[in-house]
């Protein structure tokens, strides 16, 4: 890489080149699903954090609701089991299994919350939507690029210079 430097005099030379964004990002969802909404069009300028697209989260919401219900039920049951354990009316082994079950359910609950959040695609940077690769109602897999985002605040210019020009003092 050679950095441009000023030269003495009024010398002007022209060379063919390509101007491109220094950063181009292919954005996709962290979960699979059917696209419910595209909130941008090609060429749109978007800000960091802005919503780009949303998947249908119906099934994920149902899974979350079921896990929340199980967690509430087991939490209530744990209150009773703690009292029974304190009075030595259940074995340590049974109590420890119940505690472990509640912890596993807590992890599953957090995972389900994350999955619901992953149905929304937000921009990690400000930039322009260069391309949209899917349409509303299409199915996408985890990690599949839905849009291409470019940051035009930093650009690169690629050009080939003849050796005779490059070697001049």
Enumerate the language-model features and the residues they cover.
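Structured, soluble extracytoplasmic/luminal domains of envelope-associated proteins
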Residues: 38-39, 44-74
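Residue-level detector of conserved, well-ordered beta-strand and adjacent loop positions
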Residues: 5, 28, 56, 122, ...
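Short basic coil micro-motifs at the edges of alpha-helical modules that engage polyanionic partners
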Residues: 24, 37, 86-87, 118
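N-terminal beta-strand block that forms a small beta-sandwich/beta-barrel module immediately after a flexible targeting
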Residues: 1-32
